[in-house]
Design a protein with these regions (language model features):
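Positively charged n-region of N-terminal signal peptides that target proteins for export
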Residues: 1-4
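C-terminal motif of bacterial Sec signal peptides marking the signal peptidase cleavage site
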Residues: 14-17
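Immediate post-signal-peptide N-terminus of mature secreted/exported proteins
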Residues: 19-65
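Alpha-helical rod/repeat scaffolding segments in eukaryotic adaptors/tethers
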Residues: 23-33, 63, 67-77, 111-121
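Subset-of-secretome marker
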Residues: 27-28, 83, 93, 134-137, ...
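C-terminal amphipathic alpha-helix
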Residues: 36, 40-44, 51, 110-148
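Secondary-structure edge/capping motif, primarily at the C-terminal ends of alpha-helices
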Residues: 51-69, 98, 102-109, 142, ...
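Long, amphipathic, charge-rich alpha-helical segments that form helical bundles/coiled-coils
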Residues: 73-124
Length: 148
């Protein structure tokens, strides 16, 4: 009888440990997602400045006598602007979608997520990494263009 009680107690402790681990997992992933967002959000200003700079450079080249080299630079600058604008849009779209999927308590206070929302959060974690890569990549490309 004592063995059964001890076994039952161990099973309960094990289940409780699994339960608390699951509770920690979602807030941890939520924090990771928000950390990526918080890291790239300040770069939105950089994107705006680079769009303006590349457009200014492109406009000055459009006033010059056309050559093959100038045409290539104009195309590259246009590509850079397009890349920056797409990255910016990706961030805005991600924020809108993310905010529509989760409540403020879930995002800011770590409120427990149901299975469906955990699945959505896993998808959002992938999307936020893609968005981060698009932002960083477009900024790096634009900075290279602006220094030529």
């Amino acid at each position: 009888m004592i063995k059964k009680i001890v076994l039952f107690a161990l099973v309960l402790i094990g289940l409780q440990a699994c339960k608390s681990e699951a509770k920690k997992e979602a807030p941890s992933l939520m924090k990771e997602v928000m950390d990526v967002h918080d890291a790239v959000m300040p770069k939105m200003g950089t994107i705006g400045k680079l769009v303006k700079l590349l457009n200014q450079q492109k406009d000055s080249l459009l006033e010059a006598a056309p050559t093959a080299e100038i045409d290539l630079k104009i195309v590259a600058l246009s590509t850079g602007v397009d890349s920056l604008q797409k990255a910016h849009k990706k961030m805005m779209t991600w924020m809108k979608d993310f905010g529509g999927n989760f409540t403020a308590d879930e995002i800011l206070k770590g409120k427990a997520l149901n299975a469906e929302k955990k699945s959505i959060l896993e998808q959002e974690a992938i999307k936020v990494k893609e968005m981060e890569a698009a932002i960083i990549g477009s900024i790096q490309y634009a900075e290279q263009l602006s220094n030529q």
